[in-house]
Amino acid sequence: MPRFVDRVVIHARAGSGGNGCASVHREKFKPLGGPDGGNGGRGGSIVFVVDPQVHTLLDFHFHPHISAPSGKQGMGNNRDGAAGADLEVKVPDGTVVLDENGRLLADLVGAGTRFEAAAGGRGGLGNAALASRARKAPGFALLGEPGETRELTLELKTVADVGLIGFPSAGKSSLVSAISAAKPKIADYPFTTLVPNLGVVSAGEHTFTVADVPGLIPGASAGRGLGLDFLRHIERCAVLVHVIDCATADPGRDPISDIDALEAELAAYTPTLQGDVTLGDLTERPRAVVLNKIDVPEARELAEFVRDEIAERGWPVFLVSTVAREGLQPLIFGLWQMISEYQSAQPEIVPRRPVIRPVPVDDSGFRVEPDPRQPGAFVVSGARPERWVRQTNFDNDEAVGYLADRLARLGVEEELLRLGARPGCAVTIGDMTFDWEPQTPAGQQVVLSGRGTDARLERTERVGAAERKAARRQRRTGDDAERGTTERGENT
């Protein structure tokens, strides 16, 4: 059973909003009590929270499906449904959240950092909230909006100040155990280290963290060995340290060629966090070289021979023996100095100020386009019309009429006519496809009909904007004529 998991794919589903309630107040001695249906509760959201006590993504490996509770349905007597509680999911420090396309959504660093991974759906309005002068007692309510569903990739990138990189069996784990209290697995065979090991190092009054990652081999950036899976753990490191085995007996290997091979892998690796200005490219990080295993006479001689050649690259060189504990103190204080210089040279992070961009006044909020998959059909896109369709109960004619009114006021019907839509053509809004009938009069005064029905849906003639204007003028003329007749009768 794996104990360390640093990459998982999870399925997050936020809670749906509760449905609104369609209810009429009934009480003794209170006729015409009016609508009293409450609103549905908001669905719970899924929120990632950094917990310093969590160090792996193992829990997500066994439970990749995460669901937040939904909101409760509204009830009569103006009682709103309870909102679904937000689900707070604990993640390790250094977790990176990617969407299904690999796009970076959040970089969670620091205890208590929060990120809303999936937003809960809004609750539907009850008929009490939908009542108006034209529709005094609606016989319908709006449905709750479905919660957001997302497929996310979580990657754990170790938060450490120093990253130790080197070939397998170079002595990286031994070095971590020698300069810190960490106790990684140490053995005399390659790839002993299968997971990153962290150690806390004391440099006088200061402390810093060191990460030991599995050994790299040529081609690690392309997926060979374990390097591709664990190179991400050095992305956050301020200083990279090449740990070189000066006592290796492998043919064709020497300290210079090992350093060149490691540098080639760093240059070929593309960090996920490349957009973070505080990190920069891996090849731009400060680097040091540790020539290890100098307790072997031949290794010490080789280290002394190549020391000046490596120093010409501008990197500090340390001769170390973890067995004899030689050269550890100069290494520790040298690394702390490099960390301090790197951090002081980084630009100060300025907190981002929230920017509010109001929707332009002339923005209709929707777009009508021909459907490329079906000639003669149209697609209506936009946040508002798509949300309205999701919240409509199509088993209720009055709710369908209300949707038609909203779309007409938004201008969808007029835009379809302008683009040449014909009766019976398919119109898709969100996940719903309609057979558009322009004869259905929308946007006019609601006529009296039974609750849950809409008499306009039974008519076959379409009433346009000009006809509605003429009807209002005729009603005003009729009212004026009736008022004049009444006044003449009173004078007589």
Curated annotation (Swiss-Prot):
Belongs to the TRAFAC class OBG-HflX-like GTPase superfamily. OBG GTPase family. It is found in: Cytoplasm. GTP binds at residues 166-173, 191-195, 212-215, 292-295, 321-323. The gene is obg. Keywords: Cytoplasm, GTP-binding, Hydrolase, Magnesium, Metal-binding, Nucleotide-binding. An essential GTPase which binds GTP, GDP and possibly (p)ppGpp with moderate affinity, with high nucleotide exchange rates and a fairly low GTP hydrolysis rate. Plays a role in control of the cell cycle, stress response, ribosome biogenesis and in those bacteria that undergo differentiation, in morphogenesis control. Monomer. Residues 441-492 are annotated as: Disordered. CDD domains: Obg (cd01898). Residues 2-159 form the Obg domain. One of its GO terms (cellular component) is cytoplasm. Residues 160-340 form the OBG-type G domain. It holds the Pfam family DUF1967. This is GTPase Obg. It comes from Mycolicibacterium paratuberculosis (strain ATCC BAA-968 / K-10) (Mycobacterium paratuberculosis). The keyword rRNA-binding does not apply. It comes from the Bacteria. Residues 358-438 form the OCT domain.
